[in-house]
C-alpha cells in the first residue's frame, strides 16, 4: 500500500497528495459522491459498517474498507465500544468485518475513539493501519494506528478545500 510505504519512508508522494475517504458508507455518499469519483476516476475509500451494509461498491473507484462490523455504538462509559471492549473482542469484530469485505488493511475508528487496547485489537486482527478523526496530516513516521485527517463536510466550498489541502 502506498500510504504505508510513504509512512515508512519507502515511497515519495508529491506535496498536496490526498486520499479521499468516506465514513459509514451512507447512501447519500453513494448517491452524491460516488458518481463524481467515477466520472473523474478518483480512487476513494469507503469505510463501511458491515453489520448495516454489505453491498458491493458503487464504483470500481471505491474501495470498501472496515469501519468495524458492529461496534458503532456507545459503550459503558458513553464512548464508543472501541474503547470499552477488550482487544480480543475488538479483534473478533474486525475479523467479522474483514470476512465480509475480503480485505484487511485499514479501519476507521468508530466516532474516532481509540486507545492502546483498541490499537492492540486492530493489530491482533491483522490490520496495519487505523484512521482517527483527529485533524492533521500524515507524514513520514506517523503512527499507522492513529492516522489523522482533514475533514470535509457537506456544503464546504472549493475555497475552503483548497486552503485545507494547500
Predicted regions and their residues:
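N-terminal pre-catalytic segment of deacetylase/amide-hydrolase enzymes
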Residues: 1-18, 156-166
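Metal-dependent polysaccharide deacetylase catalytic core of the NodB/CE4 family, i.e.
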Residues: 14-18, 26-28, 32, 38-118, ...
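Beta->alpha turn/N-cap motifs
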Residues: 133-134
Amino acid at each position: 500500500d502506498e500510504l504505508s510505504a510513504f509512512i515508512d519512508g519507502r515511497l515519495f508522494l508529491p506535496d498536496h497528495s490526498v486520499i479521499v475517504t468516506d465514513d459509514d458508507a451512507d447512501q447519500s455518499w453513494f448517491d452524491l459522491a460516488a458518481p463524481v469519483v467515477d466520472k473523474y476516476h478518483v480512487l476513494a475509500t469507503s469505510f463501511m459498517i458491515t453489520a448495516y451494509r454489505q453491498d458491493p461498491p458503487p464504483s470500481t473507484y471505491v474501495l470498501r474498507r472496515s469501519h468495524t462490523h458492529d461496534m458503532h455504538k456507545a459503550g459503558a462509559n458513553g464512548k464508543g465500544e472501541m474503547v470499552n471492549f477488550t482487544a480480543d473482542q475488538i479483534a473478533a469484530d474486525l475479523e467479522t468485518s474483514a470476512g465480509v469485505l475480503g480485505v484487511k488493511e485499514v479501519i476507521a475508528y468508530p466516532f474516532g475513539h481509540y486507545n492502546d487496547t483498541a490499537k492492540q485489537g486492530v493489530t491482533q486482527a491483522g490490520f496495519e493501519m487505523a484512521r482517527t478523526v483527529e485533524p492533521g496530516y500524515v507524514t513520514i513516521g506517523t503512527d499507522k494506528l492513529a492516522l489523522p485527517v482533514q475533514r470535509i463536510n457537506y456544503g464546504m466550498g472549493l475555497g475552503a478545500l483548497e486552503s485545507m489541502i494547500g
